[in-house]
Amino acid sequence: MKQFLFAKKSIALRILGFITPVLLLSGCGKEEEVVPETHIVVEAPKVSVDEFIDDANKKLDVATLENNTAQWVYESFITDDTALISAQSSERFLNTQKELQAHARDYQQTSMSPVTAKAYTNLTKGRELLPPDKPEEISELAALGTKMSGIYGAAKYCKDGKDGKDGKDSKESKDGKNCRDLTALSDVMANSRNYDELLDAWTGWHSISPQYRNDYARYIELANAGARAYGFNDLGASWRSGYDMRAPDFETEVERLWTQVEPLYKSLQCKVRGDLSKHYGVDKVPLDKPIPAHLLGDMWSQQWSNVYSLVEPYPGVGSLDITGALVKQKKDAIAITKIAENFFVSLGLQKLPESFWQKSMLTKPRDRDVVCHASAWTMDARNDVRIKQCIQPNEEEFLTIHHELGHVYYFLAYNKLPMLFQNGAHDGFHEAIGDTIMLSITPEYLKKAGLIDKVVTNDQATINQQMRMALEKIAFLPFGKLIDQWRWKVYSGEIKPEDYNKSWWQLRTQYQGIAAPVVRSENDFDAGAKYHIAANVPYTRYFLAHILQFQFHKALCDAAGFKGPLYQCSIYDSKAAGEKLQTLLAAGASQPWQDTLQAAIGTRQMDASAILEYFAPLSAWLEQQNKGKTCGW
């Protein structure tokens, strides 16, 4: 089973794949696939390759339902019992994969039709986790994955210095008064402007992850053992093999895309640093140094929209109080989800199945621990689709549910395809779809949805709206790139366990221009404070999604016949845009992503030019604002 999680919004996506704990890219050095040295005695194939692929689809159909169900139960009701069920299910799924991968080797030199060849590629390349040869290592790998996710999901920071996980550390931690989970700590990061309060929340959450630093190092060993058993140098080589291009070419492509957007990011970082320095003082935010990581409104400094009030170009002009409107209108989780559903229905797509409303978890239960990380699920690869999200009436959750339903509608669009084709064209596509929809949440759309009364259109309002969007979209780009850059080097062995933390902060400073707010050491494990590390979820997909969503948005706006600046376009209520979107979704993973991109938007290459077009007004404004300043770090 795959998990796809979007960065800022804590968005997880569970769909068909081959593993519960997920990974995606890695290391340096030689990355071409090599002929594997195997311990399995390979006999001549007993069935044709077409029969083998048909059998693989059937086995995955059964295994996916069983495994997804076990993971759903665990993430929506975290106990020792459900953790055991989850781990055992993961182990069975890994063994199913191991069996299929072993048989797939028999057909390496077999000629195939294009359709069969694509299914075979989907089965054998780009796998996010490959099972080791030894059964005991498969069991250990599955158990470690469950353990790390469980620690993260149930973790609490207690002021008395205990982790609070078992609630037995003190009288205060027994009643929960002195302990805060990630949701509570994230609220502090989002809303407080007190330097010391923010520092306490940041250091508190980052004190959790050292618990599984050693487990993570062992997990890497086992994951690499599995990758080597199937002919890859390390797991990262497997990850990079899944993009319908040579692995080295993929790395080059990611770097090319970053080069396109890097100047805009650096301009944004310079302006934000200057405004934070005005608020906190130059002693706390020097104008020629990286920004302290706890001051950007987010636990990971990955998206900065929560500090908008400190950097707003023209205070109060054209402000959109989505949170205030949701609270005033008493919109609950179902009502908010209905608004998002209506967006897709307006494009000509189907209503959500009734089972969605019966089986989804849209609010946080009061009686148990759950993984609140918002996630979209397809349980049976047919019509049993669900959302797991702890929805509250605020802007972030409102945007998140639009994004999550993008995943759900992707599931529904390709649910008639064989299992090996039930996926995004590549993993960035799945994340991009939800965010493409979010780009259409314009002031005009919000007015049609009844959440604002009037739309203010002038240059100052435009710059404000673009700044708010850039704090989310542009601020994210280097973070989206660097997580797997770190992980690639961990998999390849270039980064040793004893250097995990030092190398993490080197990359964060290099790309983001941020720094740890307090002294860090190798007793810390700051990379592990991010869910996607704990749960081994790939991350480069989110960087790619941020590029693709603007490409998709431009193409859909063209289909809708929109005339005007790209940032003003909403495809809401456009059946023509809906048709093009459906074409993009329905292909699933049945063909190379380049073919899907060509059919949908007329190009075979990912490109960031649409981002630059979208943010052209802000880019010019930032250039003016930064004149005479020392930018960089």
Question: Model-found features: residue ranges?
Answer:
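Bacterial signal peptide processing site
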Residues: 29-31
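C-terminal, non-catalytic "cap/extension" segments appended to globular domains
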Residues: 34-49, 81-82, 234-237, 306-318, ...
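Short pre-active-site segment immediately N-terminal to the catalytic Zn-binding motif
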Residues: 385-401
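N-terminal helix-rich structural modules
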Residues: 36-165, 171-218, 236, 530, ...
